[in-house]
Amino acid sequence: MSNTMPEGYIPRPGKDQTLEAYISEELSKHNLTFNDVLNNEEMMAELSKDDAFMKLKAEFENKDKPEVVEASSNKKEEKVSEPKVEEKKDPEPEKDAPALVVEEVVMDDDDADEVEKPTMEAPKSTVAKLTETQFRIDSSNLMSKIDFTIAYDKLMTVDSFGVEDLVTKSPFYATRLDKPRHMRMDEFCNEFIEPAIPSALGHPNSEGYTDMVGFDWEKNQYLNLYEELGRRSVEAIELDDDANAGDVIIGGVTSLSMIKQVNAIVHDAILPKGRLAYIMAQMRAARCLQFTRVANGQEATPEDKLQAYMDAYMNPTYTRALRIRTPEPRVVTYNKAIDYVMYRLTLNADNDFISPMVQISDSIDVGRGVRSRSYQAATTVMSVIASSHRNLERPMTSARAPAKVITAFTDLVAPPAAEAMQKLGSYCLGGRRAELTVDMTDPILQSTDSVLAPIAAAANLILLDTNRLGNDIKRTLVYRMLSPFYGTGTRAEVDRINFNNIPRIVLTPIPDRRGLHGRLANFIRRQLTKPAYGRMDRNDSRIWRADIQTTPMLPFVPAGGMTPLSMHIGDERLENQAYAPQANELKVSLMDFVKMFDLMHARQGKETYLSSQFSAILTNESSYLYNSISMVMRTMIRGWESLDLLPPLDGAVPGALEMDRTEAFVLPFTGAVSFICYGIEDDGLEYVPWEQRKEIPMPSSFPMLLDMEIRVANELLLEAADPAGRFTRSDMLINQDEFINMAEFIMKKYLTSIDGGEFGTRYRLHWYLFEGIRIHNRTLQTPGIEDLKVARRILDGVKYPEDIATAVYIKIYESVNPIDLVNPDPQRSDYQVYMEEIPADDEILEIKDIVTYRREDGGEDFNFTPYLHSGETFNLDLIRKLAKSIPGDHRYVKVPTKVTVKPVELLDNVDVIAEDFTVALKFKKGVNEMRFEASDIPLYYRWDKFNGRSQLTLDVRVFPDTNVLLDHVMESDPRMGYAPQVLNDGTVGWVSTLSGNVYLEERKVCRREEEVLKSGIDLLIDPYGV
């Protein structure tokens, strides 16, 4: 079609116009054909209502009918089969198609039989084949040995660490030692863990234990030996190491972690491939639940200092994509108004996907919503557990058995077992900030001579983890368990105890040491077979605590202790036999207490019935209990897919409000003894891990590909915007191809293929990273606004100088919540800027103090640190990192600089997005004077009408992302009604305090046209933005 055709043009024919006249007079002047009109949906929607056009349409379609009928059948076959042959021979053009295009021709119902008949002039329909991809699931061994070679006496060379599967070679791996930027980019790529399935566990041996050679404790032994020999032998020997060989010669292992700042114990830091992503997926939600925040604080709270390290581990989008099993299509939305106001996971009460920034005032509601969804999801998962139909052997007559024994077995029923396992599993899956307790109002507890009460109390202490119970519950359970064994003494015995007249107790030596040896052997075995977990330093680690052993928390531990890890990321069905040892331990422990209970009755001269009765119950059908335990575990595994689940924490976390309990999971008092005696049943379906994951029930995976592209691009943008990130926005703009390669590499970790072609993934990533994303300001709703200042903008007749010598103040610590610019009434022509008060001298750290500071740990000077090289351009992030290492309560780093301002005039009232700008920090080795430059800072202004005349004002809705505040210094004029105040360095400016109840005040305009800018611009860089 011609480009000169008017927009919305509809070629309507005349009433008596012929087909030839219509084509020559109406269509040809716009370079249109009749087929073009038929294939245009907008035109046909209007012309189908025109009778004159419909007559011409019928005439056009019947015009060539005889020629089509006379054509031979061979020609017809050639016409139909020709596109198929071309499609098989040359499928490549399909990838280059820009989008899915389906051309549809609107026809009458009478002409429906004509659809399959090809016409000579009709263009071929172009249908772009969408890229179909699927999630990449690799296979990985659960355990790999540590290989090393000992030469030169005790000198050790490590050939394999056993953690190579955790690291993938990124596009920057080869040059990571030559370019510091590539080292940081390689580390960033390795934070995205590849999903993997560990190899299946072997079958247990005849004793019910899985062979120890297949678990991490053997790896720990290698690491311990390696660490000990390495620390003793290699201390003063320096050898050359080939960077590409993978061999490591080291004199003392301090950490095997892949991430800096993590101070981990060596033999506790080994994790199976892909495991970490599942654990860290919950951390973002946990931050909303556990930590208290300081609104608008001058120095960030400890959790905010660690935010940059925590964010790197949080990839809930990918974790959810790997674990999702729902046929519902995922809707990909992209709101241009909140492009950059995104975190990896910003929570609200409705969903876990990307949403606008949550304000601090909403943190409590966010926490409640997240916890409620966690409790609800966990309860729904465990609801499939049902009561057992197992029949118990009960006392048949009351002639031999006492009435209270018969009553005890009458009260021992199956339903409490199912209720107990439902609530216990719900607590373990989603019990964050919830309390686990036992119902102490059961009617059985009201009877003082109940036989079942002490047995049920003992069963609760045997089955449950007492560290999860409150002290009051534990005291009550112990009291009820021991109540039959005291309180029956004589008055004389009580008096003797009160007068300290207690007989001396003589401890006899243990006659048989085999029992002691057995206990020691069991203790050692339990220690060696614990699941590996990382014990990290809270001051330097990315997360305060990562206890893999109890996250997710599991109520039952199978033989070997490593089976839970394979269950969560494994590829075979759960082995019930692995729980036989623990099931047997539960039975033996309960029988020991029952025998002790019967022994007391025998000493009192009473008949004993409990031991024989419980022995018959627990020994009949011995497989029922470990099958029931397996059902509980299988149900929990089935439900662990949901990202809503937040497991309980193991121990106190700094900053956590552990006293704030929002939910209670109350177990029935007889639930534990009922579970040991009856077991449970499962109404849920059989569960085969990864079966549905291999075939995602979606009509097309192309939306998933688009969604992943946006998420990966957002990850890179967030890392660049983070002051503690590994690269900056300037790095991205200068090295665009490298960052697009990085995004593609990360996507290929999760997807088997990406969209190629001219308009494929690479094209879209370039748009997301460098074309379509802009910084948008958010609304100022931060507490503490009364402490801010309002800088008056009196700019009538001001001409901005191009180069200005001034100072830059770089804020060291970010505030908890950003302070942004606000204009609630866009129709007004007056604008104001909020700025913080300039800090005192003792809060300012000079740049020269940073570069000349020598660290107490013996580190080298600034000029010799491994991150800095002569002539390198430093960004703001590096200055902040160096400033944080210097003791003292400093808030800003002062840098003498020269600023270049770029005035930008706004011609209309629409919002304009600020372009990025850079602040280059440069130095020369050996020169004390540091020189820095801030270039091309956009300063937006517009000419507005005020009292009938034009006036130059700043537009503050479009300031850059770093919230650079430009204070324009004016000459003092008492007639304006404002007294000048000193901001810093003798600079005088117009400042007035903003009331906490009012966001904006009416600005007062300078009516003197001769008012000019006297001195320079004071540049305050305050990185409140994203």
Swiss-Prot record:
Annotated compartments = Virion
Lineage, top-rank taxon, reads Viruses
Key words of the record:
Capsid protein, Inner capsid protein, T=2 icosahedral capsid protein, Virion
Q: Does the keyword Transit peptide apply?
A: no
The segments labelled Disordered in the record are 60-96
Where is it found, in Gene Ontology cellular component terms?
A: T=2 icosahedral viral capsid; viral inner capsid
Where is it chiefly localized?
virion
Is ATP-binding among the key words of this record? no
Function recorded in the entry: Self-assembles to form an icosahedral capsid with a pseudo T=2 symmetry, about 60 nm in diameter, and consisting of 120 VP3 subunits. The capsid encapsulates the genomic RNA.
The entry's protein name is: Major inner capsid protein VP3
Species this chain originates from? Micromonas pusilla reovirus (isolate Netherlands/2005) (MpRV)
Q: Lineage in the entry?
A: Viruses, Riboviria, Orthornavirae, Duplornaviricota, Resentoviricetes
